[in-house]
Amino acid sequence: MSKVGTGDSKNTLYCSFCGKSQHEVRKLIAGPTVFICDECVELCMDIIREENKSSLVKSRDGIPTPKEICKVLDDYVIGQGHAKKVLSVAVHNHYKRLNHQTKHNDVELAKSNILLIGPTGSGKTLLAQTLARILDVPFTMADATTLTEAGYVGEDVENIILKLLQSADYNVERAQRGIVYIDEIDKISRKSDNPSITRDVSGEGVQQALLKIMEGTVASVPPQGGRKHPQQEFLQVDTTNILFICGGAFSGLEKIISARGRTTSIGFAAQVLAPEDRRTGEIFRHVEPEDLLKYGLIPEFVGRLPVVATLEDLDEASLKKILTDPKNALVKQYQRLFEMENIELTFADEALGAIARKAIERKTGARGLRSILESILLETMFDLPGLEGVEEVVISREVVEGTARPLYIYADRSDRASETSASA
């Protein structure tokens, strides 16, 4: 175990595993009753690493197909078929890349980071959140609006890798195979065409900082709980195999695309549509890298996002489905709230259409549906806990339009409170 020998060597310490003396190794670590040398520690780490790799290969043998991923997305996200296909294929290929790199070393497969462009409330963030539910790799979301260059007030880009590491329970091997979604990426566009006016610490500066981690670098991340000791070493995370998905509304990009379209077709045969005559999602379909450069993204940043997926505007039919079809649909959520009061909440089909039209008029997409429902049901939710005998509340189109109040149906059918008089 510990001390062996006679004479001068009686105080010499030996490794309990390989038997080498303290003079033959760089360091000898003492336990309660044993010693282990640095060489045996490294050997143990190599064994653990190999076992982790083999377990990763086994876990990725059943790679989910793009159709399987898309099917799960369909359960939560209505419409956006093209964007779902792009994301499903990208995630599937991400799994395949990791599997290929673990097993083979002949051809290096480069990753294809993704840029999601779509109007407000079209489902970009929801797609990313739903992916987080179904993936077997660590996943994190970051907000680009909070990022600044290192050294300035705000979060620096290394914080993104720290969040990914936290989602992997500080397992560096797993974090290096994760997926990062960066929201509001359009907010870090260059603020001015003249870079010499002021230092753009939250725009072009952040783009430059993101370039490194998106392309692949070794980021230094503080260990769990932060650095409590000055000599405590940072964790090194290689970002080469981390897939980055960036999303943004890119408000105003449609004008740049439309302007380019007008300059390319002139003459009597040219068909020119004003931007307001076409839906934003339809215009986004024609986006080119040069449009993103004019918007304020630097060429190097655009080059690191080779896959561009555009999302469509949500029409009335899609918004109605969003209200009722997904597993966590808004109507189902409010019906559950009313069930807690033992009351049934019913929406007429015309009422759902009126709610969808309101969201379209406000140009808020699916994100605006909750605020519309809140305003419609506010008075009802305020009154109901104090009322007795109500078993059903019916919401009609007139209620949504503000010309009537909800219909309360009481348990005693002879006493039906039909509060459908016009509101003052």
Curated annotation (Swiss-Prot):
Protein name: ATP-dependent Clp protease ATP-binding subunit ClpX
Function: ATP-dependent specificity component of the Clp protease. It directs the protease to specific substrates. Can perform chaperone functions in the absence of ClpP.
One BP term from GO: proteolysis involved in protein catabolic process
Entry similarity comment: Belongs to the ClpX chaperone family.
InterPro entries given in the database record: AAA+_ATPase, ATP-dep_Clp_protease_ClpX, ATPase_AAA_core, Clp_ATPase_C, Clp_protease_ATP-bd_su_ClpX, ClpX_bact, P-loop_NTPase, Znf_CppX_C4
Residues annotated to bind Zn(2+): 15, 18, 37, 40
Lineage: Bacteria, Pseudomonadati, Pseudomonadota, Alphaproteobacteria, Hyphomicrobiales
Domain ClpX-type ZB: 3-56
Residues at which ATP binds: 119-126
Subunit-level organization: Component of the ClpX-ClpP complex. Forms a hexameric ring that, in the presence of ATP, binds to fourteen ClpP subunits assembled into a disk-like structure with a central cavity, resembling the structure of eukaryotic proteasomes.
Transmembrane feature ranges: none
GO annotation, cellular component aspect: HslUV protease complex
The organism of origin for this protein: Nitrobacter hamburgensis (strain DSM 10229 / NCIMB 13809 / X14)
NCBIfam families attached to this UniProt entry: clpX (TIGR00382), PRK05342.1 (NF003745)
Entry's Gene Ontology molecular function annotations: ATP binding; ATP hydrolysis activity; ATP-dependent protein folding chaperone; protein dimerization activity; unfolded protein binding; zinc ion binding
Alphabetical keyword list: ATP-binding, Chaperone, Metal-binding, Nucleotide-binding, Zinc
